[in-house]
Swiss-Prot record:
Family: Belongs to the RuvA family.
Protein purpose: The RuvA-RuvB-RuvC complex processes Holliday junction (HJ) DNA during genetic recombination and DNA repair, while the RuvA-RuvB complex plays an important role in the rescue of blocked DNA replication forks via replication fork reversal (RFR). RuvA specifically binds to HJ cruciform DNA, conferring on it an open structure. The RuvB hexamer acts as an ATP-dependent pump, pulling dsDNA into and through the RuvAB complex. HJ branch migration allows RuvC to scan DNA until it finds its consensus sequence, where it cleaves and resolves the cruciform DNA.
UniProt keyword annotations, A-Z: Cytoplasm, DNA damage, DNA recombination, DNA repair, DNA-binding
Location of the region described as Domain I in the Swiss-Prot/TrEMBL record: 1-64
Protein's recorded name: Holliday junction branch migration complex subunit RuvA
GO molecular function: ATP binding; four-way junction DNA binding; four-way junction helicase activity
Pfam families recorded: HHH_5, RuvA_C, RuvA_N
Gene for this chain: ruvA
Species: Shewanella sediminis (strain HAW-EB3)
Domain observations: Has three domains with a flexible linker between the domains II and III and assumes an 'L' shape. Domain III is highly mobile and contacts RuvB.
Source organism phylogeny: Bacteria, Pseudomonadati, Pseudomonadota, Gammaproteobacteria, Alteromonadales
Top-level division of the source organism's lineage: Bacteria
Region span, Flexible linker: 144-156
Domain II: annotated span: 65-143
């Protein structure tokens, strides 16, 4: 079981990174909420991982904090929620926002996420309520601490910001028309791709 990786961040293309650890390159998929807390390329990064073995692939999912990984692990235990959908959920909202949705029985917000229908949202609310109580008790005071001490700075503005944003939304399961409309609605001159993706996601919730 690979539970933690520490190495050089050599590639970043949302939602995937390539982390070089002692000469080996690990492909890691991350929720966007974690992805944008990473340092710049060619800097050291630490990610907590969840390893999935399937018949046709071996996949690594990465997170900035243990608490976020713990939430991911709870999500994939929910009936009808696999790693891909769990990653989409944590890309569309932070861990604390998801917890708030469960506490408020907020189905309306959950069903706006791609792949989350009404039945899945209802299952999440029912099955996650008790699980989250245990998680919050175990991590009281520590959830999303990294947000307060993050050294993240936006990447330089590039001409393909809109293309990158649309590609990231498509990778999360949004339809081309949805992605294009959301990006166009929030785009402003000077926006970098990371800010544009965040704004686009917020506009759809």
């Amino acid at each position: 079981m690979i539970g933690r990786l520490r190495g050089l961040l050599v590639e970043k293309q949302a939602p995937e990174i390539l982390l070089e650890v002692q000469g080996l390159g690990y492909e890691v998929q991350m929720p966007l909420t974690s992805f944008y807390e990473l340092p710049e390329l060619n800097q050291e990064a630490i990610v907590y991982t969840h390893f999935v073995v399937r018949e046709d692939a071996q996949l690594l999912y990465g997170f900035i904090t243990k608490q976020e990984r713990a939430l991911f692990r709870l999500l994939i235990k929910t009936n009808g929620v696999g790693p891909k959908l769990a990653l989409t959920i944590l890309s569309g909202m932070t861990a604390s926002e998801f917890v708030a949705c469960v506490e408020r029985d907020d189905i309306a917000t959950l069903v706006k996420l791609p792949g989350v229908g009404k039945k899945t949202a209802e299952r999440l609310l029912v099955e996650m309520r008790d699980k989250l109580k245990s998680l919050m008790e175990a991590s009281a005071g520590s959830e999303r601490e990294f947000m307060l001490k993050s050294n993240y700075t936006p990447a330089p503005v590039i001409n393909t910001a809109e293309e990158d944003a649309i590609a990231a939304l498509l990778s999360l399961g949004y339809k081309p028309a949805q992605a294009s409309k959301a990006v166009s609605a929030v785009y402003q001159d000077g926006m970098d791709s990371e800010t544009l993706i965040k704004s686009s996601l917020k506009s759809m919730l």
